[in-house]
């Protein structure tokens, strides 16, 4: 499955960055004015920031918020759900020759400058994009492909109160 997904992503011109060397490469892309897309629903381990996700504290990567703040980059939270063929541009096509249709749904656009002077901008931004992701999933739960343990790491009791 991983090889198939990698091949599909690379065939559209995307450069994939491995988790182990991501920070240096992501920093280079951002510093050069590039754009970065990330899967925001991954468990970040015990060092992540814990924010509510479907009512439970979830360890979430800080890098999205940190890089947005450092490079003054917008965070665009979006989903690409499949839509019925009759709603796509090929509405008059027959089922045999229709392409698969998708919609692009922008759920939130987060401006990091809005968080200047806040006591915990990383936590607040992380919570906001996680809430936006949750709304996208709730609209199309049948299309969400969950193959990992999102709540694998749980916070110590002091973090539980912060995430609730």
Predicted regions and their residues:
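Non-catalytic C-terminal accessory region of glycerolipid acyltransferases
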Residues: 20-164
């Amino acid at each position: 499955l991983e090889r198939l997904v990698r091949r599909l992503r690379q065939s559209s011109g995307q450069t994939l960055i491995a988790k182990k060397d991501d920070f240096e490469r992501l920093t280079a892309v951002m510093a050069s004015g590039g754009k970065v897309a990330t899967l925001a629903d991954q468990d970040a381990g015990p060092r992540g920031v814990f924010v509510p996700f479907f009512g439970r504290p979830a360890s979430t990567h800080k890098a999205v918020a940190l890089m947005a703040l450092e490079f003054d980059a917008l965070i665009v939270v979006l989903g690409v759900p499949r839509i019925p063929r009759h709603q796509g541009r090929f509405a008059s096509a027959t089922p045999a020759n229709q392409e698969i249709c998708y919609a692009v749904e922008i759920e939130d656009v987060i401006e990091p400058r809005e968080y200047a002077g806040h006591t915990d901008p990383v936590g607040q931004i992380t919570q906001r994009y996680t809430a936006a992701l949750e709304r996208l999933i709730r609209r199309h739960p049948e299309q969400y492909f969950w193959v990992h343990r999102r709540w694998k790491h749980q916070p110590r009791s002091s973090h539980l109160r912060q995430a609730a």
